[in-house]
Amino acid sequence: MKQLWTEKYRPSTVDGYVFRDDVQRKQVQSWIDDGTIPHLLFSGSAGVGKTTLAKILINSLGVNKFDTLEINASRENSVDTIRDKITNFVGTMSFGEFKVVLLDEADYISPNGQAALRGVMETYASNARFILTCNYPNKIIPALHSRCQGFHIEKVDKTDFTSRIAQVLIDENVEFDLDVLDSYVKATYPDLRKCLNMCQMSSSDGTLTAPN
C-alpha cells in the first residue's frame, strides 16, 4: 500500500516547516532552545499545519514516545475521556522532564469537558504540558485560553500553496496540466492536507485527472 502523501511530505523539523512570519519561527525555536513549552493553543483553518507544528515541537524537545498522548477530540471528547484517559496518563511518573498531551480539534470538546480539562491542566502542571489545536478558537472556553499561550497559524498564500502541491506531483512523477491543478487548488484552498489527498487519489495512473 502506498504511503499517504500527507505523511510522506509532512515536515519533521523546524527548518522544514513553512512559517508565515519570522516572529513565530523565533518563538518556536526559543521553546526548543529552552527545552520546555507552556500549555499551547494552536488555532487556524483546517490543513494549515497545526498538528504538524505540534509534532515538530514534541520531536524537537526529545519527548519520549511513552510520555506522549495524542487524542483526536473530534472522536474522543467526553468528560470521561478527560477524567479517565488523560488523568491516568498525566498522573503517572514521566520518563523524561515532562509528559505532553496533544489534543487535536479541541473545539469539539463540550464546555463541561473543557472545564474538566482545565482542572487536569492545573493539577498536573508540574508533570505535563498540553498542546491544543482548534479551527475555531471562539469555541474554547475563556478559562482554557487564559491557561494556554495562543498561537494562530495563518493560511499560506495561494501561490505558495499551488507551488507546494506542484512540487509533490513532480516528486511523485505525476504528469499534470496546470489548469487541472488549479481546479484542485480552487476546490480545497487553504486546506493543504485535503488537496494532497484529492490529488493522490486522482493520479493513481501517473496522470492527474480533472476532478468530477
Residue positions per predicted region:
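P-loop/Walker A NTP-binding region and its immediately flanking N-terminal helices
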Residues: M1-A166, L178-K186, N197-Q200
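Active/ligand-binding-proximal structured segments within catalytic/core domains
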Residues: K194
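Crotonase-fold acyl-CoA enzyme core
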Residues: L169
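Conserved C-terminal helix/linker of AAA+ ATPases
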Residues: C199-N212
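Short, conserved phosphate/pyrophosphate- and ester-handling motifs at nucleotide-, phospho-/glycolipid
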Residues: D191
